[in-house]
Amino acid sequence: MSRKQLALFEPTLVVQALKEAVKKLNPQAQWRNPVMFIVWIGSLLTTCISIAMASGAMPGNALFSAAISGWLWITVLFANFAEALAEGRSKAQANSLKGVKKTAFARKLREPKYGAVADKVPADQLRKGDIVLVEAGDIIPCDGEVIEGGASVDESAITGESAPVIRESGGDFASVTGGTRILSDWLVIECSVNPGETFLDRMIAMVEGAQRRKTPNEIALTILLIALTIVFLLATATLWPFSAWGGNAVSVTVLVALLVCLIPTTIGGLLSAIGVAGMSRMLGANVIATSGRAVEAAGDVDVLLLDKTGTITLGNRQASEFIPAQGVDEKTLADAAQLASLADETPEGRSIVILAKQRFNLRERDVQSLHATFVPFTAQSRMSGINIDNRMIRKGSVDAIRRHVEANGGHFPADVDQKVDQVARQGATPLVVVEGSRVLGVIALKDIVKGGIKERFAQLRKMGIKTVMITGDNRLTAAAIAAEAGVDDFLAEATPEAKLALIRQYQAEGRLVAMTGDGTNDAPALAQADVAVAMNSGTQAAKEAGNMVDLDSNPTKLIEVVHIGKQMLMTRGSLTTFSIANDVAKYFAIIPAAFAATYPQLNALNIMRLHSPDSAILSAVIFNALIIVFLIPLALKGVSYKPLTASAMLRRNLWIYGLGGLLVPFIGIKVIDLLLTVCGLV
């Protein structure tokens, strides 16, 4: 992936975010964040009080009140800036995608076949079901399915990957995306969406996040913050009559400052930015999430369903051994296996030819000179081979060869059954070779488990995540590979129905399930899974069923998706812990200062020995504003993430963000108080 990464504080983004922060000062924008709306009202109230004091309409220190008012407005601006900067980064990423959209014309065919009469129409007028022709050099005008032809397609504008991909009719590689370019040949495409509903349109809308809905956890946290704010609002409101009864009423400006320092403004100001940044980080991994809900669900996932091929193993099975049947020498088996594989262009077939050459110096023969009939592999027969000089040689799965032998009046040897089981237990795939009705032996095809994958699964296990390998292999082979890879469980001989049933079973147990898929047959399971990552190279049905799309089409990305989701949840939790711990420290600064005149005994709480009541209150308000700015990078980048158990993670966060939240305000408020005193500002 080569998509350009944005700097955290890109100058143009910062300038734009500052402008947006000022625009967000209007009440319509502010009421969406209840905590910051209280600060906004406090800012407005203290501004009015400052003006009244300056005009002589009210008694009091107009300069002090104006300073408090100014820093309260700055607090609101900083919170707006954090959200605007996160949104600006997402919009910048969306703008790079908008550059892919081009106003162009399309050749709309009157009949669904190559060579039919074509009408030139604007691409944005194409409707679902329309048939278009695209040739080398053309931009594909719509999302759709290839119904005829095959071509090399440059998808770098969407995926960031420069290597072209093949798109052709039939199978799982028939889906094309509007905005990509044909490099060679031609395609006849049936449009699958209406204007404004293309994959690119959805990507842009999702990335911009203009209509980003709050996730369930975000709503729950917002309710908690509102509850805390109401409690502190009521507590602060009752303080005025107490102080008035004591003979020295506390000013409204001080009460507003006290309220703002008590309520959780830090997390209140950063909450939206954390959510927007989570989706932005997902895009940085080249994964498009349909909503923040999908990203959040990724953080709560506790079961991963992983395809064996390409995710756990390298996916290119290689012939590793010839195991002859009783009474057959290994060279005879190798010669027959090589002959049966001469026309087999699959990686497995080529590896059989090469292994026979390496073991017994059996040179690859000229296919044309053999005057033989080659039998291709089909899904029905599940075997392939060659007919040459009255010899009928076949290689294939155990069941297919067994049926072939019995159909030709032969008997499948018991010793070969044992050898098949032995190969399967070692994690390899057995292919049986037969000549006529005589079974010659077994070829072991070994799929290599990816390096480091066992360690990654161990990390996931530490985090309480169960890993389940999905494979079409038989149970013996699946069990051996599962043991080698270190997964917790496996589903062998998997079918779409079996996958769907397994997901429902885990969900019935109260678990959240994540999986990947690329084919139409994966669509039901993708639709059922809590986190469903569809491959961009997959079918349209798979992409529509999933709630995320991996532009790199890398099944291993599912593990990274879970990490990003957990990092977002950890960031939100860590900053909430820091914010609430912050408030405890601010009590010691502002409460003694606010009520020292009325209740001198409260001076015992002035453990920071701040210069004066005015400097203490102003220092706390200034710190309350500045801490939001200092935490913006953490909100956007996310807290440092390490795979740990839930209890270990909780202890770590309490030490770092709980204790840090207690200590930092003591230091910060004291330093600000000293600076105000030295500069003679209080």
Curated annotation (Swiss-Prot):
| Binding residues annotated for ATP, in chain numbering | D344, E348, F377, T378, A379, Q380, S381, R382, M383, S384, K395
Query: EC number(s) of the enzyme?
Result: 7.2.2.6
* Membrane spanning residue stretches: 34-54, 62-82, 219-239, 254-274, 588-608, 616-636, 656-676
Pfam family example for this protein?
Hydrolase
What is the annotated localization of this protein? Cell inner membrane
Q: Which SUPFAM superfamilies match?
A: Calcium ATPase, transduction domain A, Calcium ATPase, transmembrane domain M, HAD-like, Metal cation-transporting ATPase, ATP-binding domain N
| Keywords associated with the record | ATP-binding, Cell inner membrane, Cell membrane, Ion transport, Magnesium, Membrane, Metal-binding, Nucleotide-binding, Phosphoprotein, Potassium, Potassium transport, Translocase, Transmembrane, Transmembrane helix, Transport
Report the main location listed first in the record.
membrane
InterPro entries, A to Z: ATPase_P-typ_cyto_dom_N, ATPase_P-typ_P_site, ATPase_P-typ_TM_dom_sf, ATPase_P-typ_transduc_dom_A_sf, HAD-like_sf, HAD_sf, P-type_ATPase_bsu_IA, P_typ_ATPase
Read off the NCBIfam families from this record: ATPase_P-type, kdpB
Known function: Part of the high-affinity ATP-driven potassium transport (or Kdp) system, which catalyzes the hydrolysis of ATP coupled with the electrogenic transport of potassium into the cytoplasm. This subunit is responsible for energy coupling to the transport system and for the release of the potassium ions to the cytoplasm.
Could you tell me what this protein is called?
Answer: Potassium-transporting ATPase ATP-binding subunit
- Tell me the name of the encoding gene: kdpB
